[in-house]
Amino acid sequence: MTASLTQQKIRIRLKAFDRRMLDLSCDKIIQTADTTAASAIGPIPLPTKRKIYCVLRSPHVDKDSREHFETRTHRRIIDIYSPSAKTIDALMKLDLPSGVDIEVKL
């Protein structure tokens, strides 16, 4: 069974440490999809992943004195329905910041 172009869906998963950069990238992707007559749903926010690192402050003793650092990974999903070849070309030519990780599934 082959799916026609009207039934296809592109799922774009975005990850970044900076929420503002992630939202700007989502806006660019949605604007690109809208200009090529494809319907975009999203951005759908996913839960933020927190990774906490615990480090001893002193190099020798004083195990009671510790310092905590954390990284937060913000994630979003955008679904693009009924994409055309023009939509895919426009998405490939899109210039996004280097701090945003993009994963595309067809």
Swiss-Prot record:
Record InterPro entries: Ribosomal_uS10, Ribosomal_uS10_dom, Ribosomal_uS10_dom_sf
Sample GO molecular function, one term: tRNA binding
Gene Ontology biological process: translation
UniProt keyword annotations, A-Z: Ribonucleoprotein, Ribosomal protein
GO cellular component, one term: ribonucleoprotein complex
Statement: the UniProt record of this protein carries the keyword Ribonucleoprotein: yes
Superkingdom per UniProt: Bacteria
Role noted for this protein: Involved in the binding of tRNA to the ribosomes.
Family membership noted in the UniProt record: Belongs to the universal ribosomal protein uS10 family.
NCBIfam families: PRK00596.1, rpsJ_bact
Assembly, per entry: Part of the 30S ribosomal subunit.
Stated name of the protein: Small ribosomal subunit protein uS10
Protein encoded by which gene: rpsJ
